[in-house]
Amino acid sequence: MFLRTQARFFHATTKKMDFSKMSIVGRIGSEFTEHTSANNNRYLKYSIASQPRRDGQTNWYNITVFNEPQINFLTEYVRKGALVYVEADAANYVFERDDGSKGTTLSLVQKDINLLKNGKKLEDAEGQENAASSE
C-alpha cells in the first residue's frame, strides 16, 4: 500500500518579458482628434500636460488610444482640462529628418485611464469669462 502524492513543479525563472510603461497624472491639454487607420480601425489622439513641481517646467505628452470603450468614454464624458491618471505602454522610435539627421520620438499608447476631476463645461467657462469681462 503506497500512497501516491501529487507533485507540483515550480520554475524559478519565467519567460522573459521586457516592457516599458509610463504613468502620468496631468491635465488633458488638447481636444480629442479621431483618426482611422489604414485597416479601418478607429483611434484617438490627445495630449496631457503634467507639471511635476509647482515651480517646474510643464511636460507635454502625446497619447494614442486604440481601445474602443476607452475612446467612447473619452469622447462622451471627458473634457479638455480634466485631471487624469493615465497608464501607457511606452516605446522610442528613431526617424530620419528631412536634413538627414536622426531624431527620436516617444510613442505612448494608453492602456488605462482614470478620471480624477473633469474639466469645466464649455458653458461654465464662457460664463466665467463673461462675468470677468463685465466687472
UniProtKB/Swiss-Prot annotation:
UniProt-recorded name of the protein: Single-stranded DNA-binding protein RIM1, mitochondrial
Oligomeric form and interacting partners: Homotetramer. Interacts with PIF1.
InterPro entries (UniProt xref): NA-bd_OB-fold (IPR012340), Primosome_PriB/ssb (IPR000424), ssDNA-bd (IPR011344)
Function: This protein binds preferentially and cooperatively to single-stranded DNA (ssDNS). Involved in mitochondrial DNA replication. Stimulates PIF1 helicase activity.
Span of domain SSB: 19-117
Main location class: mitochondrion
Alphabetical UniProt keywords: DNA replication, DNA-binding, Mitochondrion, Transit peptide
Disulfide bonds: none
Domain of life: Eukaryota
More about this protein: Present with 3060 molecules/cell in log phase SD medium.
Gene Ontology CC annotations of this record: mitochondrial nucleoid; mitochondrion
GO BP annotations listed: DNA replication; mitochondrial DNA replication; mitochondrial genome maintenance; positive regulation of mitochondrial DNA replication
GO molecular function, one term: enzyme activator activity
Record localization: Mitochondrion
CDD domains, per database record: SSB_OBF (cd04496)
Transit peptide, from-to: 1-17
